[in-house]
């Protein structure tokens, strides 16, 4: 695949960064299925597109690991990151939960999943195997602080002591987790974080992330966090 770089000739922010944006999953491996019967990859692509435009308008340079219809391996994502010279690798995802918390139903005759109990909010992951772990934490913390200022709380369900979860919480107030084995984080040689924007199996949270004004507020928070760090 060929990654692409885009910039806008606009007034620069106080510091101009190169941000490697990684839209999680692909059309062939579309990720979680939400309560609206929409796959995660759709939300990832939309969020990355809007975030990319906001970053460029703020004077940052953006590199993408893939285009919306491209297929790409996890190793290739890390390879692109390591060749990019970027200041930050930011992988964008939308969250689900373990099946014990979910029930299946249909939306317009299409299968969908929803949570039985509220599971709402963002979460941010880092890997201590990343060679710039402390820098990764600093970026993660800055983004989390800005999201919290919006009134957006983190979800802590990934710390539940059940199969498939039990992730180490580095900061429960900010929703920061350590997940060492995440390949796109541990194999990158630049600061790297994975952001779960919201929980799409929770009907209320999916409605939140599906609303453009809410996405714009979160994206603005992320861009401001780059100046904070």
In which residue ranges do the predicted regions lie?
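N-terminal export/membrane-targeting signals
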Residues: 1-3
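Nucleotide donor/acceptor-binding cores
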Residues: 16-19
């Amino acid at each position: 695949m060929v990654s692409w770089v885009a910039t806008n000739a606009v007034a620069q922010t106080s510091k101009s960064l190169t941000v490697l944006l990684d839209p999680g999953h692909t059309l062939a491996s579309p990720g979680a299925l939400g309560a609206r019967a929409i796959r995660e990859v759709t939300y990832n692509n939309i969020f990355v597109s809007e975030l990319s435009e906001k970053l460029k308008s703020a004077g940052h340079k953006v590199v993408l690991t893939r285009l919306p219809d491209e297929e790409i391996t996890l190793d290739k994502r890390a390879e692109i990151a390591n060749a990019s010279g970027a200041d930050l690798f930011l992988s964008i995802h939308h969250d689900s939960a373990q099946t014990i918390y979910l029930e299946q139903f249909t939306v317009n005759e299409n299968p969908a999943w929803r949570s039985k109990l509220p599971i709402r909010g963002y979460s941010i992951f880092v890997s201590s195997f990343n060679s710039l772990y402390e820098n990764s934490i600093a970026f993660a913390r800055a983004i989390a602080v800005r999201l919290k200022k919006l009134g957006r709380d983190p979800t802590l369900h990934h710390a539940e002591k059940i199969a498939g979860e039990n992730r180490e919480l580095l900061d429960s107030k900010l929703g920061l987790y350590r997940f060492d084995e995440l390949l796109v984080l541990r194999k990158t040689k630049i600061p790297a974080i994975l952001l779960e924007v919201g929980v799409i199996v929770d009907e209320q949270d999916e409605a939140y992330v599906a609303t453009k004004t809410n996405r714009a507020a979160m994206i603005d928070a992320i861009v401001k966090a780059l100046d904070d760090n």
